[in-house]
């Protein structure tokens, strides 16, 4: 029994500093600026953080030197896979449609990857 409890405790502490990160690769559409994207994204994060007890963070990575200055990235950081799943379920239910329309009007995102990140 002590061995099982010790193993569970080690598992919990090893994931305590882990986050789930979603990385989007996007481009600005004509007539829109990175400031437009940042405003939409800020409102999106505020809404996400109203929905659960977990806290999300989001970053807009703006190119400072690139062969395509319309390209940028989003990094959305969720506390864990459960948090990401809760938000994803709400997206599937249409709770984020107003933001999706705004993002689609200003950006084209062709790729997304989901990562588990741990501090090292």
Where are these regions (language model features)?
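Positively charged n-region of N-terminal signal peptides that target proteins for export
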Residues: 1-4
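Conserved active-site beta-strand-loop modules that form the wall/rim of enzyme catalytic pockets
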Residues: 7
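Short S/T/G/P-rich N-terminal loop/turn motif that feeds into the first structured element of a domain
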Residues: 10, 14-94, 105-120
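Non-heme di-metal
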Residues: 97-100
């Amino acid at each position: 029994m002590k061995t099982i409890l010790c193993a569970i405790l080690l598992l919990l502490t090893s994931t305590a500093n882990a986050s789930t990160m979603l990385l989007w690769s996007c481009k600005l559409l004509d007539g829109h600026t990175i400031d437009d994207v940042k405003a939409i994204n800020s409102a999106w994060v505020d809404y996400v953080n109203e929905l659960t007890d977990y806290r999300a963070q989001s970053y807009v990575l703006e190119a400072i030197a690139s062969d395509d200055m319309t390209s940028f990235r989003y990094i959305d950081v969720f506390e864990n896979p459960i948090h990401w799943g809760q938000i994803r379920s709400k997206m599937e239910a249409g709770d984020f449609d107003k933001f999706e329309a705004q993002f689609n009007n200003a950006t084209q995102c062709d790729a997304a990857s989901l990562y588990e990140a741990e501090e090292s």
